[in-house]
A protein has these predicted regions:
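Structural motif
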Residues: 21, 129-130
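Active-site HxH/HxHxD metal-binding segment of metal-dependent hydrolases
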Residues: 13, 32-128
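Conserved beta-strand hairpin/beta-sheet module of binuclear metal-dependent hydrolase folds
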Residues: 1-45
C-alpha cells in the first residue's frame, strides 16, 4: 500500500513529503537534516528519488544528509533550482537568520551552506517512473 507522510520542520515550518511503498520511497523537499532521515529509517524505507520544488534552504536543508546516508539516491530539480543549490544568495542561507527573526524567532544561528547540484534537471515537467 502506498503511504504519504508529511514532515514539518519546526524552525521555518516548511513541509517535506515522504511517499513510500514496499521499502522504497520518494522524498519531496527534504527540509531538515534529521527528521526525514530518521523517519525513513524508522519506516524501513530507502529513498530512491528526491524531488526538489525549489532551492530555498528550508526545502533542501536535509538533502546532503540523505545523499550521504543513501549514496544511490537520485535527485531531480529544475535547472534553475539545481544551480541555486550551490549559491548561498539563491538558496537563501545568507538571509535565513533575518527571515527567522521576522518570523518571530530572533537569535537563531543558521550558518550558510550549499548542496551539490541535482543529478537530473528538467524545465517544465518531470516524469518519474517508479
Amino acid at each position: 500500500m502506498l503511504l504519504l507522510e508529511r514532515w514539518t520542520e519546526p524552525l521555518a515550518e516548511s513541509n517535506c513529503y515522504l511517499l513510500g511503498e514496499a521499502g522504497r520511497a520518494v522524498v519531496i523537499d527534504p527540509n531538515d537534516p534529521r527528521g526525514p532521515l530518521e523517519r525513513l529509517e524508522a519506516l524501513g524505507w530507502t529513498p530512491e528519488r528526491i524531488l526538489l520544488t525549489h532551492e530555498h534552504c528550508d526545502h533542501m536543508a536535509g538533502l546532503e544528509a540523505l545523499r550521504n546516508r543513501w549514496p544511490g539516491v537520485w535527485v531531480a530539480a529544475t535547472a534553475a533550482c539545481s544551480a541555486g543549490l550551490g549559491d548561498t544568495r539563491l538558496n537563501m542561507t545568507r538571509r535565513m537568520e533575518v527571515y527567522l527573526a521576522f518570523r518571530g524567532k530572533p537569535g537563531v544561528s543558521y550558518p550558510p551552506f550549499v548542496c551539490r547540484p541535482a543529478d537530473e534537471t528538467y524545465e517544465h515537467a518531470w516524469e518519474c517512473v517508479w
